């Protein structure tokens, strides 16, 4: 069973990855190929967060799963937007 603290800590990490990726997405939208490495790193952080989430999800209770599902939806949405961006 996942502890509340471990889920909260993980969600904070996801928020960090989400904010970093949003920043890079906005920069890439304006500057195209200025900093491809940072853009790719932000995509990698999203992928890692989604992978780690699957492991944590399996040992979470219903309330924790709901919080993780919401974060997963946000991460997936941004990941898809980044993929579709003509960068």
Label for each model-derived stretch:
Residues 1-3, 21, 36-37, 71-85:
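Aromatic-enriched hydrophobic runs in primary sequence
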Residues 2-35:
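N-terminal acidic leader/helix
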Residues 4, 61-65:
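Short, structured coil/loop segments at alpha-helix boundaries
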Residues 8, 36-47, 65-73:
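Short, charged, amphipathic alpha-helical segments
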Residues 17-24, 45-52, 74:
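Amphipathic, well-ordered alpha-helical segments in soluble domains
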Residues 27-30, 34, 55, 62, ...:
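Heptad-repeat coiled-coil alpha-helices
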Residues 48-62, 77-87:
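Amphipathic alpha-helical coiled-coil segments
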